[in-house]
Amino acid sequence: MFALVYAIATPVLALSTGRFRRYQLLVCYSIVFVLGNLVMALAPNFQVLFISRIVLGSVSGALLAVGVTYIPELLSPQQTSLAISVVYGAFSVAMVFVTSIGKFVADTLDWHVAMYGTLTFAVLICGALVAFMPRAGQTDEPATFREQAGLLREPSIITGMLIFLFGVGSVYVFYGYVTPYLEQVLGMGTVEASTTLMAYGVFCLISNILGGWIDARFGMKALLVTFVLQAAALLGLFAVGGTMPLALVFVFSLALLMYLFSVSCITHFMDVARSRHPKSMVLASSVEPMAFNVGISFGTAVGGAVVSSVGIAYVGAVGAVFSLVAWALTLVTIKLARWERKRTMAQA
């Protein structure tokens, strides 16, 4: 539910708040984010906890999207890709590494303790954002719904979002069920599985940073190699079954490949916005969280269907097919982006 609300609310808020200044949005989203975490920590029952998660899902993507728009203004073009990769790397590691820590704390102490830890981080980080981010900038000019929505009609933006749908979906067919995979297929205990997930998170961080380095040097064309390797890793999981330690080699290889494509797609979205839709920079930075979380929901749903029908051992094979679809979409996006650049130059 969190991922679904996140995916829907992020672009909706970007489109509907274009008339407000960016710093005002940053403050408002930060306040709601902290209050959502406070309610979650104090939740007396599951119903209140569920509502707090919906509130958090509704502003988390918007807060991330607004924050990312500061990066091109604070850093040089050469540093932007790496900075974006660090931001999304931290986000990705939180989904894997910190989730494992939270699960461990909840299992050994109490789930409220884990929520208080989350609240503490929320207060510290949001406080730092509000205190140190510039009050004004290039993206503060008011924008109407129509001025922003034009970005979503660009063909290469549409295919770029589909890259996320199938690229993220290919991994989450497997990763959505990684814990039962580790325990049922590889025969790990609870502690071993948690340790493996923490190591997986470290590889995910490396994946994001490496993705920034690759994007700065090779751009989107590097994804044509990335998705072939990702398909190979997923097929490897299917082929080796529960054979240890070979299966772990493919698991960690997949973690290393998992986010290599993210920065290149984000850079593409923001480049298109900067060159042809300059008032839609916040929306451009919202596209990734939206598409990413739709990909999570899509991949997890397909993975669930696979697990309940043919069995968890087949998630790798299905994920590999999605990786190849993402490869084809990357090729189309590269060609469309080239055509759009030529069209823009001709109109200049």
Residue ranges and their predicted role:
Residues 272-310:
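A late C-terminal transmembrane helix in Major Facilitator Superfamily
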Residues 21, 42-48, 59, 76, ...:
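Helix-breaking motifs and short loop linkers at transmembrane-helix boundaries and internal kinks
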Residues 157-198:
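Extracytoplasmic gate region of multi-pass secondary transporters
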Residues 119-138, 330-333:
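C-terminal membrane-cytosol helix-exit motif in multi-pass small-molecule transporters
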Residues 46, 52-91:
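Cytoplasmic helix-loop-helix junction between adjacent transmembrane helices
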Residues 35-39, 47-56, 245-253:
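Paired small-residue
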Residues 8-46:
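Conserved MFS/SLC helix-loop-helix module at the cytosolic interface between two early adjacent transmembrane helices
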Residues 9-22, 208-219, 307:
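Helix-to-loop junctions at the C-terminal end of transmembrane segments
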